Amino acid sequence: MYGKVLCGVLGSLLWVMPGWGQAEAEKERILARFYPYRQGLPQVAGITPGMRIDHTNYQVAAAALPAEILQYVQAGDFAITVQETTDMPLREAYIRATLDHFARVELHDGELRHYVAGLPFPLIDPHDPKAGEKIAWNHRYRDRGETVQYWPSNELRNRDGVVERADRFYIAIVFGMHRPAEAHNLPQWAAQGVYSKNYMRTLAPSDVEGNQVLTCSYDRDTSPDELWVYDVKTRRIRKLVDNPYQAGGGGELLMEDRSGFSGYIHLYEWRYLGAQVALVPGPIRTATPSWGGRGNWYPLDPWELRYVDVVEARPTGSHPVYSRRLLYVDRQTSVTLYALAYDLAGNHKRTFLNVYLRPAFGPGRQGEWVPHIAAQASIDYQRERASIFQTHRVVANEPLNLNRFSIVGLMLYGK
């Protein structure tokens, strides 16, 4: 009886307060985005956990893989083992910040307004002409924690799998703005509009050991990054003009290709191509990923089916390498799972395969889980070689000495 009365009262309230009912419905839709697998796991006919997909049965994955990747499974370049879909919920604080602030966020003439924290656009209308651009902003402000330290390596491998060059680094990143709890932002950085700072030190090989790079990224997408480089040989610091189209170390990864896409949003025209279930590299259950296939280019840890949004990005101006790129963005975490890039003639040139650490696994201290990258394979099929970026240790959300993230710090930490 009490339950019937309560339902009647709530029904009356919803009738007289339609705004409240709409807000609750929006909240449920947002939570469904952050927890998409609680109502069941995605399925594609013929694909089941434990199966192996290779050149003998590649057709089974035709609905879940882009043709640009499927053709190399068909050719026998690599094979895929399938695992069950992994639920990877983000931090509760990030989800709560999304619910608290999303309603006021606006996209006006390519600029984000009234953004505070969390996911800027948790509700994507597929018919919205700005849907693709909104997903790009979601990717930019995905949950990456407050601080993170990586100890990665990068190898340039040729068609035979021979490593032509290998580098090792220490990377530390601090996000000074848009933390889930506003009180935890860095006031001085926020006053200057500094979103994040990235410190990188080269550990090997010996000819470049001790070189340092400090990158300052601003919250405004139209404000270019500032870069300072410390040269260990001259013990001098130079300020460089940011070039997102530069490939470090002569590899197959432009600066803007990192994590699938880390370039300037305003330099591209964005188009939403739709949602789908895709077969993608799954989060690994080991400290480091396994490699194999042609050239030792491909991550061999199991792949899995996940809900993704597919977005196309075309340069609004001239680009030295690409005419367009496709991003396959994870619905739950807003990370890019893989990306495809096309040359100026429109031919498929590069594939970027991103592998992430699984919750409760991975090297180092991760604290509350955020999707840290374990590896990125950047494969150039025209040049027949690949850059393999791999993380060997991660320490997340621990206090860092901010002196390191300054020009003075480059001198202090210089050899």
Predicted segments — roles?
Residues 209-211, 223-224, 320-325, 337, ...:
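Short, surface-exposed coil-to-beta transition loops
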Residues 23-224:
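Solvent-exposed N-terminal domain segments of exported/luminal and surface proteins
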Residues 207-266:
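Loop-centered beta-sheet repeat module
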